[in-house]
Amino acid sequence: MKNFVLFVICAVMLSSCTTLTRQEHNQLRELQAQGVTVDRPVGNYEKPASGVAAGALNLLPGIGNFYLGTGNAAESSHVLYGVLNLLTWPLSILWAVPEAAIDADNINKRELIYYYTYDKQGKQELKDANIKLSHHKAEEQTHAFEESF
């Protein structure tokens, strides 16, 4: 029974990584093709999560996950991962430190996409930098089509 519980806990921990969807990967590639990355943004975008801080905080029982679950661009599922890491500490250090660093990077990528896709200021910064994304072009065409009626 003890091995089964340990297996379930490990399976939950290994599946707890934050991932990007295919659409988010495509949008990220499009931004990167225009020279916009998490490390080299256009305008005032700031990374909401630090991978180094999240990883270092997870040396303590689950604190890095609580940081990712409650800070800017919070993903609430990380609070649960933090509780599970707390319950399995000190063993959880083995997976929690790299998991938190990777998840912080993915959260930053997701927020970069959101900022330049939906945020008014982010859209304006792309426009000022003369960068057009394909989904913005489609929106402009739809808007022009609607105005013609």
Predicted region positions:
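Sec-dependent bacterial lipoprotein signal peptides
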Residues: 1-19
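Compositionally biased, low-structure terminal segments
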Residues: 5-8, 67, 146
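Short linear sequence elements within intrinsically disordered, low-complexity coil regions
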Residues: 12, 71, 119-123
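Transmembrane helix recognition focused on a "late"/terminal membrane span
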Residues: 17-55, 76-149
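Core segments of transmembrane alpha-helices
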Residues: 57-59
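Alpha-helical transmembrane segments of multipass membrane proteins
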Residues: 62-63
